Amino acid sequence: MRLTASAIAGQFGLTVLGDGSTEVSGVATLAHAGAGQLSFLSNPRYRPQLADSQAAVVVLRADDAEAAKGTALVAKDPYTAFAKIAALFDVAPVCEPGIHPSAVIDPTAQVSPGAHVGPFVSIGARSRVGDGCVIGTGSLIGADCVVDDGSELLARVTLVTRVRLGKRVRIHPGAVIGADGFGLAMDAGHWIKVPQLGGVVIGDDCEIGANTCIDRGALEDTVLEEDVRVDNLVQIAHNCRIGAHSAIAGCSGIAGSAKIGRYCLLGGHVGVVGHLEICDKVVITGKSVVRNSIHEPGEYSSGTPLTDNRTWRKNAARFKQLDVLARRILAVGKEKE
């Protein structure tokens, strides 16, 4: 597929600088783009690459337009504009409607004639798969699940039981949704399993990364509201609620019954203690641990920043003496009084 700069600008409301008839057939980074490819500049640290880039078209802000050698598309937010343009060249294989002969479908399950059910799929009792859905190879849909219209389960996705997916949900390989929550009670020195009788509800336009686990609730449902984006290898425990338009980066863990607001961003390897609340529009930076509820929007961090090993070892040794040093300072203060 080849598109002109003018056609792209018209589709996404961008301004063309230079030759609008310039054609592009793909996308690439500034450093590696060649003839016929489109790139973008959004982060100032990559501005030096603009002068040497061989990209046919570059999406950038108006402030950077003078540095562009060839055709440019001016956007208020170049990264968002690039994402929309790149989607034009992301041609996924077409999955034709139909059920593969190796699929096993319970007689009480309902599968839309417009859905694609791939090889070795299993669909359990009373579950429903909507129109335009794609159920990838080896995926398992347990009993009493709903996969609404236009949703896609890539290979080896597991919906254990009582999982309801909204429209246009995309789940990547290896994800497990609706497994038992980690509910235990101690009785006479032995653990007793607490039955997990709830389910999982995932709203429209959510995306769940590979090998992520979202446990079903003990009594009430675990809920992800609409347009939540979850990266790979994330654990969301039972009875959590994630607000709409929030995003959670890889290797994060959210303990049971935590409530996260709308438009929140959690960096990689963030830990959230259970039974707390995070308000809307909170950013938690990578490797932070949230131990208390957050009631004010903003950016929050915890942990030790990276430094050279020698400095870190000295600081670690001093940290062990922190209580002693604090007592000495208090004692000096009292003496001066």
UniProtKB/Swiss-Prot annotation:
Pathway: Bacterial outer membrane biogenesis; LPS lipid A biosynthesis. It comes from Xanthomonas oryzae pv. oryzae (strain KACC10331 / KXO85). One of its GO terms (biological process) is lipid A biosynthetic process. Belongs to the transferase hexapeptide repeat family. LpxD subfamily. Catalyzes the N-acylation of UDP-3-O-acylglucosamine using 3-hydroxyacyl-ACP as the acyl donor. Is involved in the biosynthesis of lipid A, a phosphorylated glycolipid that anchors the lipopolysaccharide to the outer membrane of the cell. It catalyses: a UDP-3-O-[(3R)-3-hydroxyacyl]-alpha-D-glucosamine + a (3R)-hydroxyacyl-[ACP] = a UDP-2-N,3-O-bis[(3R)-3-hydroxyacyl]-alpha-D-glucosamine + holo-[ACP] + H(+). This is UDP-3-O-acylglucosamine N-acyltransferase. Its EC number is 2.3.1.191. It is an enzyme of class 2 (transferase).
